[in-house]
Amino acid sequence: MGILCVNHRYGCQTYMGVKYMNLWENYKLALNEILPDLTFGRSWGSWKSKGTYLLAKTFTHPHIIKSREVEIWNEKSCIYNNIIYPKTGSNLPCFGMDLMGFFDKKVIIVFDFQHPVEKYSFSVDGLPVYEGDYRFFEIGNHFSKNIYIAKCTMSEVDEHLDMFKTYLTKYKDMLELEKPTGVDTSEYKDFDTYMTKLDPVSGYLTGKFGKEQSESLVHDFLFEYGVVAT
């Protein structure tokens, strides 16, 4: 049986001939509007298991090594994860977004400037400083003082869209000011290794797609520049 759009107010799109909930549609549109030079790179994976779908893709840009995104969805949930890795040589942070709609009443929105250097204190003037419960996120270690974390319902996700646009526009300004051109991906080794250990959805992925596929996604796609623990 095909996946149905759970609630029409969230928007729908079609994949493999079936409609599915597109909870983060306006966030993805904002990404394309603010960074219009993002160009499709490759499709890494397209999976279906236990009624859950996954798409993993990369995009490139004159000043970005890659923007790698993964979308995971089923009848009840819709998750969008993306990290933008800037080209090197200008000491710029990555820009990460974890947009996680697990079910109608449990949605977690996170976006931030994520610096690849360990214990590097990074902040942006004019943006809010987060003072709540960090849980997974260690402020000052690959996460900035401006990390944005919100919990809401599915009907409330667009209430945070303007702030998302503000953060992403600040990031675009950094790219345009510095115009990085380096492609030394070794600069992201520590960052990806740290993120691999931190990954909050690995258990969810294993439950849906099995351990082997889940580990491949994490090590070969999400955090491919990291060191695999032995």
At which residue positions do the language-model features occur?
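Alpha-helix boundary/N-cap detector
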Residues: 18, 22, 155-162, 166, ...
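N-terminal amphipathic/basic-hydrophobic helices that include classical n-h-c signal peptides
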Residues: 1-19
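Surface-exposed polar/charged interaction patches
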Residues: 37, 41, 170, 174-181, ...
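Histidine (H) residue identity feature
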Residues: 8, 13, 61-63, 115, ...
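Alpha-helical oligomerization segments
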Residues: 181-230
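Short Lys/Arg-enriched alpha/beta "domain-start" segment
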Residues: 17-95
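Extended, non-transmembrane interaction/recognition domains
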Residues: 81-180, 184-186, 193
